[in-house]
Amino acid sequence: MQALVLLLWTGALLGFGRCQNAGQEAGSLTPESTGAPVEEEDPFFKVPVNKLAAAVSNFGYDLYRVRSGESPTANVLLSPLSVATALSALSLGAEQRTESNIHRALYYDLISNPDIHGTYKDLLASVTAPQKNLKSASRIIFERKLRIKASFIPPLEKSYGTRPRILTGNSRVDLQEINNWVQAQMKGKVARSTREMPSEISIFLLGVAYFKGQWVTKFDSRKTSLEDFYLDEERTVKVPMMSDPQAVLRYGLDSDLNCKIAQLPLTGSTSIIFFLPQKVTQNLTLIEESLTSEFIHDIDRELKTVQAVLTIPKLKLSYEGELTKSVQELKLQSLFDAPDFSKITGKPIKLTQVEHRVGFEWNEDGAGTNSSPGVQPARLTFPLDYHLNQPFIFVLRDTDTGALLFIGKILDPRGT
């Protein structure tokens, strides 16, 4: 009964993003073809940087779905923005066919913007502003002795704030240099890699990111205790759980996805949206398939402010690994076969490696003890609990631009 009341109350959010996403699939009917009225574009997406953020974020949700499918029984932690940034920067050196392939994967073909790279510079400036607490960086690394055309470097520096790196051919020296770069960009928050350098590199893309959230309302550390986290219907583990018996959050229930959705604000105009299935399960595919920039934007508009009993596991996770196969799955196999990067060099080169290193954490830390006085929770006739004590998905979103900053599938808060 409680769920039904919330469902009716927040029914406007159900299915908006999925319907919009489905309408973009090949062969689907459009308003023009059916004679139906054309839905006016949301004013939020008329802002160039927001529209670009939506496109890049949709790439991010695609990448997450592929990665999650590859690891159905493991945590997934990604900052897709850093990978998208590396690909977008690489497209500066691509001729038309190869450039179009990259732009389609990044959904640039759906936006009319003659200055994609200039707008990307604005997006990066917004999401990496100091108050956001996000560190994100990308780098293009080329094979040893490659002669790069001088015309490639200035636009790369102008829009993406980075210079390419050419390998020395000494794997120990190259790994040390890459580690030093990562340490400098992430201020030591992402661990140094001990993995060996790949033996055959032509183009190596590296995306790194780190985020430590600061809640708008901090948790009382005295209320943190070891509690059960349900890995599945049969297994539990003890993890540190933060709690707030009078938390103010934004909430809704999606009957199509059979999950409870909550949003908590962070400092710096960011927020985390949680997707919690109604039943304990590690199969989160139904939720994952719904995720698009448009759907998340609709959720952000429609959730209602309520007061609830809230418990959240403390989280400190990291990931280091290859995303090469995942990127290939996003209709980018041609970059690994015979692409045309003749704006970079006269020599045939191709993408051979995509690597991702990220760190993410939240704990009790926050800005204050009281929620914003301007936001009054709705009165409910029933108590509301929101316990993240089972597998869930979280989305870290930039409020200003709508950009996807981090996404995670948490099957075990202890990490792997």
Swiss-Prot record:
Cellular localisation: Secreted; Melanosome
A GO-annotated cellular component: extracellular space
UniProt keyword Cell inner membrane, yes or no: no
Function (record text): Neurotrophic protein; induces extensive neuronal differentiation in retinoblastoma cells. Potent inhibitor of angiogenesis. As it does not undergo the S (stressed) to R (relaxed) conformational transition characteristic of active serpins, it exhibits no serine protease inhibitory activity.
Residues listed as glycosylation sites in the UniProt record: N283
Tissue: Retinal pigment epithelial cells. Located in the interphotoreceptor matrix (IPM) which is between the retinal pigment epithelium and the neural retina.
Gene: SERPINF1
Keywords assigned: Glycoprotein, Phosphoprotein, Secreted, Signal
Oligomer status and interactors: Interacts with PNPLA2; this interaction stimulates the phospholipase A2 activity of PNPLA2.
One of the protein's GO biological processes: positive regulation of neurogenesis
GO MF term set: serine-type endopeptidase inhibitor activity
Phosphoserine carried by residues: S112, S225
Family from the record: Belongs to the serpin family.
Domain of life: Eukaryota
Database matches in SUPFAM superfamilies: Serpins
Protein source organism: Bos taurus
Signal peptide, first to last residue: 1-20
Protein name, as recorded: Pigment epithelium-derived factor
Domain remark text: The N-terminal (AA 42-139) exhibits neurite outgrowth-inducing activity. The C-terminal exposed loop (AA 380-416) is essential for serpin activity.
Organism phylogeny: Eukaryota, Metazoa, Chordata, Craniata, Vertebrata
A family per Pfam: Serpin
Keyword Oxidoreductase: no
